[in-house]
Structures are given as structure tokens and as C-alpha cells.
Amino acid sequence: MQNTELLLKELTLEEKCALLSGAETFKTRGMPQHGIPQIWLSDGPHGLRKQAGESDHLGLNPSVPATCFPTASAVANSWDAALGEEIGAALGEEAAAQEVSVVLGPGLNMKRNPLCGRSFEYFSEDPYLAGKLAAGYIRGIQSKGVAACPKHFAVKSQETRRMASDSIVDERTLREIYLTGFEIAVKEGHPRSIMSSYNLVNGTYANENKHLLMEILRGEWGFDGAVITDWGGSNDHALGVKNGSTLEMPAPGGDSVRELLAAVESGKISESDIDARLSELLPLVFDTKAALDAAPREFDAAAHHALARRAAEESLVLLKNEGSLLPLAAGSKVAVIGDFAKNPRYQGAGSSMVNSTQVDVLLDKLIDSELNVIGYQQGFDRHGKPDAALQKSACELATQADTVILCMGLDEIAESEGLDRSNLRLAQNQVDLLQAVAAVNPKIVVVLYSGSVVETPWLDNCQALLYAALGGQAGAGAVADALTGKVNPCGKLAETWPLAYADVPSAADFATRRKTVEYREELYIGYRYFTTAEKAVRFPFGYGMSYTTFAYSDLVADEQGVSLTVTNTGSVAGTEIVQLYIAKKNSELFRPAKELKGFARVTLAPGEKQRITIMLDDKAFRFWNVKANRWEIEGGEYELLVGASVEDIRLCEKISVHGTATVHPYEDRDLDCYYKGDVLHVSDADFEKLLGHPIPKGKTKIDRNLTLGELNHARSPLGWLVWLVLTILLDVSYKRGKPDLNILFQYNMPLRALAKMTNGAISMGMVDGIVMELQGFWILGLVRVIYEAIKNVVLNAQMEKRLRGA
């Protein structure tokens, strides 16, 4: 094992600077002459994506086969941190077998808005639940000697303009909603690394944000690992290093090294800043490399497939079961309809896409079951194209069956990295099919596949609804067993399903092309809004049915937690997820009506009862006092609410809590809309009162951070042409029903990323020449690009020679 302190004395300043950026898309720099190995990083929120051949960061090229587990959005419905730890251990085992040192996951961004195209990679709208699950994944991954890298830190809630948007959020909301999940993950999971997000937070890029990285992450939480940029996400590398960012990825080349050298020479940063970052990176490199050298190069694919199936079973959510249609009796004549039954949708698109070791198919599993499958019909085109013939054939089959199993869902394009959803609706051809089938056979079980929320105005057309989410490669077997009763669904929703998208508090201005993203709704996201505003929803947070029933009784509560008795009052075994919320009526603060502060899973046989305890932690009663700039507790009477969902509260006890607050955070501000939870249309004036300063107005500037999608603002025909070509290509891909992820990435990419993602082929000086050209200095800009290109080639060659020790 190398001694980092001694190594820092051996390395030249140039070598030190070189180690703080990647060498290839998923590889760090190695320096064999100093005994420093190169290590692999790989995407892996729900399955490893190591690309042995040509690499990319969008999942476009094939990867080594790996187990595809249910996505985070699915596993969150299990409310099972121990299951997350098992999945994490399997991910770590596969990473070690493939010689990957860092698994880039889990993702635990808050689900501010259900249109976020990457929601399938995230756990929940609730920070407590997300943090607990993420901590489980992290512990599991790192139990195999591999480093976990939770992401994206922080306040990233959309894909639109993701590399250049500025999240404007008040400090209380930042702390209580958008950082608490990460805090739990860091303090309870102890990750060796963490990924910074692309976006700015209150005017400063997250990757160089001193408040986030140094004051909170490293200072308050005690994180001593490596902060890794999202791919191409570095804006000012030197400032990032100074303010706590460790490793710039993927491969910016020698230009990045020269940037740090110049910053040290100018006094912008010091060599001690460089050493501090290497003291975070080098132990990770040496420790993980030693663990991988000792790890087997194979893993038990069958065992991991079985784990993926169990994870899918625990993640299924039964949303409707009218007349106890489910489970279906053995021998029932069933018609299987829907393209997803034969061509499964089991994962999302983008950098998390896994090359699965195998994929189960629901139709095959149903045929192998005790059901009498009388036939299958595709029913609809999965990409939304109307087809009367497919619908007619499906209806004819439905007339011959006792029950119809209709598989509906979102297609691969509806949910993807790089692209936010345009609405919450299912394709109309699927809804039309459901209505047509219901007219000839009302006994319909809908199996729904999606990574996030969908609107369900069609719910009355089916008798049962089983939410399969994106259940991974073994999800089909789990669904088949749930339909036949071999598995009793026990999942509960980790996010609210609204009646309509317009009810979502951030609906009015989500994913616009504006440079700023204003978090006007404050604390009121998800159930925190709906319960406070008393707004009806389709399915509340924490909701999920079972084939059995449970009774709650004998609640005892104090400041430490609650204990109660749970009894299975039904006729089959089942698992209940008991949820603990707190409420404070007549609070002097504005606060959500209810907030999740604990939960427990309990599995019971018919008639069995069990005493369970749910403990409260240091986050139960705290709030961030923006005036005192610290965590405090509002004293007084609280209600401890125990229930089966946020709306189904079974037991309640009142307790008195000693307060620590000495000053009211809002005594000099009129914030009625926040006290009422009326945040659908917060005025500029009210939001500015909350922020304590004017709302920043993002202006389009022709500089390094101009995105390619904004080149229409350039003063250059070349810029206009590039913008026009990109726009046309993007529109064509949309019309084909298959948006091009690479073009989408480029469209939202700032010019500076050209120097961060081309392995040194383009320098920042060349980017500055391009900027000059776009500003209207056509000839000077072109000359600058040519000059900087020649200079870059020469300097890179000289530097690489020195770094090789030649």
C-alpha cells in the first residue's frame, strides 16, 4: 500500500495536476513510474455498464453483460433498505469481477416534478426515504471493496438545460428537501466518492460551490472522499479544486493540467489545494485496486438473477383490486394483450442502460403458470401509432377469456436521460384499446410499466391495476407470481400520483428553456404539497394494497419513537409497510401538514400479530432556521401519526417536544402563500421575500457557457447553421419516435464542454476562439482557433512525454 504523504513529496506539481483529471471516458490517469494504477469507473445505478470497447457516457455503445436489477424508482416502492444493501452488494461483486473500482450510483435526486425524464433513476419525492435507501445501496456496494458514488449533488431536478441551468432555491428548502437525503446517505452509508451535478446552485456551479462542497459536505457532514464531476460538468477546474472537487471527468486532456498549473502560478489556488484533493483521490485508487486484485473474476449470474426477481417482487404495487379479482385462480382462462407482455420494458434509457445477462418475458411466464392462457395479441403499437387491426384482434381474443391481462405502459422514448417528458399520459392508442376491450370483457387486469407517475383517467375501465414499474431483467416472473397469488404484492408508492399534471405545484414552469429554475414551491413538493393544500390525488404517497388486511393497535409514543402492534387480519401471509409521520398544528413556522420520519416492514402469517418499534432520529423535529443559520427545533405539541399511507392514518398520539429555537426565521416577512401551502402560483414578490434578495434574471451571453441549442443568438452565420442543423436533426428524431440522445446531449451542452470531453483534442483556448467567431469577430475567431489548435497539439505532446517519464 502506497503512503500518500510520501508520494505527494515525490510527485512533481505537473504530475499532481494531471492526476486530478481522467485519461479516458471511464478511466483515471495512472502513473506506473510512481506505482499509481489507472482505475475504471462505470455507470451502475441498477446494473453495471462497463464498456470494454468504444466508450460513451450515454449508453449508446454495447457494454459487458451484467445483471439488470429493478430501477431505483421501483426498489423505492419496497421501502426496504436491507434489500437495497443486498442489491448494492451484488453490484459491488459484479464491479469487482469486471475490475471496476467506482460504481456511479445510486442516484438520489428529489422528485420535484414527475416529468423529469430521469425519474426512474431516483428513489423518491421524500428525502428521508431516499436517503435511507441510498445508504443501503452504498453499504452494499462498498462491502465488496468497490467505491460507491451517489449522485447528483445537488438540486438537479430536470434534464432540460441540465448542464447550464441555475437552480434558485432558498436555504431552508435546500437543507430540508434537497440535501437531507444526501446527508443521510453520507453519514449512514459513508461513500468513498460523490458526483457533483451539472447545474448551478444559486449562481455558482455545483462542482465549484464552496457552500455545498466545503462548508456542508466536507465541513458539516465530515465527508473525506473524492468529489467527481459529472461527465463534462467542470466549468472552472481550478476553482473546483480549491472548493472541494477532486476529479474532473471524463478526459479533458493536457489543457486541464495546464489550467491548474497556471492557477497555482497566479495564486488563484495553492499547491496545498492540489495536495488536499490528491489525499482524497489516491487512497480511493489504492484501496479499490487492492480489493479488485483479490476479487474473483466471475460472479454467480443465476443467484443475482434470483435476487433481481425477489427485488421485483417486493417492489410491485397493487393499486386497484375491485371485487378481489386478483389473484387469479388456477385454470382461469386468460387472454394476454399488449406489446409489453412479449417485448418487456424493464429499464430506462441513457447512461444507466444495462446489457442484461438474461431477460424474462411475461407471456412466457404466464404460459408456464397454472393459468390457462388462451392466446396473445399485441393490441397496440408501443410507440403510439394507431392500428385498428391490432385493436380488433385483441378485442376478439378478449371475448373468449374469463379475464384479460392487459400490459400497458410508457415506451423507451418517453423516459430517458437527456430528455424530460412532455406529459404524464399514456399513449392514446393504449387507452383506446383498454376502452374497447372493456366494452367486450370488463374483467381486466392492467399491468402497468413505467419509471414514474402516469395519469390514470382510464382507471374505471379496469378492475385491477398492478404497477410493475421498471422491474429489471427478472421482473416478468415477479409479475406472473403476483397475478397467480404465489407472491402477495407489498410495495407502496414512493411518490404521489396526482389526478392531473396541472395539480403539481411546479407544473407551470417546469423544464422551460430559461437559464434559471426557480424553486418557488419551497418545501411543498410531492405529498408535502398535496396534504397541506388538501388537494385530492389519484394515489397518495405510501399507498399500496395487499391480498390480506392489517390492523394497527396499542400505540405508545414519546420523543424517541413509537411502538405498536400490527396484526394480519386476513387469510394469507403478507408484508405491511408501517409509516410514521409527524405533524405540528398551529406552528409558528410554515411547514408541511405531514412529514415522513420513520417506517418499518413487518411480515406476518394469517392471524399473526407482532409488536414493532419505529425510532425517531436527530432529523425528526428539526428545521433550518434561516435567520440563526443552523438546525433548530420548534418546541411544543406534535402529533405522531402512524398509518398505511400518508392519507390512511390509523393511530395518533400527541407528545410535547422541548424547543431550541431562539429567533423566529420569518418574523419580518409576509409569506401567507407559504403558510397556506398555496404555492401553485407564487408571485415574484413572495418568492423574493422568501429568498431575501431579488430573483436572478438569467441572460443569454455569448461566452463559454452558451449551449449549442442557443447558437441562434450568435452573431455568426456558422453558429446559425450549426443551430439549424441540430434543431432539424432533433425534430426528425422526435417525429420518428426515437429522439437521438447524442444530439439531445449536444443541444443542451455548453461550448466549454467541447474542451472537457474530447480527450484533449479541443482546448479551452480553441473554445475561446469559437466564442469570438460567434460574437461576430469571424476572422479573428478563426485565426484564434487555428493558432490554439496548433499550440494545443504541441503542448499536449510535450506534456505527455514528461508525464510518461520519458
Residues of each region from the PLM?
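Extended non-globular C-terminal regions
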Residues: 721-806
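Glycoside hydrolase catalytic-domain context in secreted enzymes
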Residues: 1-619, 623, 637-641, 646, ...
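A generic signature of intrinsically disordered, low-complexity regions enriched in glycine/proline
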Residues: 47, 368, 507, 572, ...
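A broadly tuned "polar low-complexity/structure-edge" signature
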Residues: 40, 71, 247, 357-360, ...
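Terminal connector regions
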Residues: 618-665
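Charged, amphipathic alpha-helical linkers/stalks
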Residues: 646, 653-723
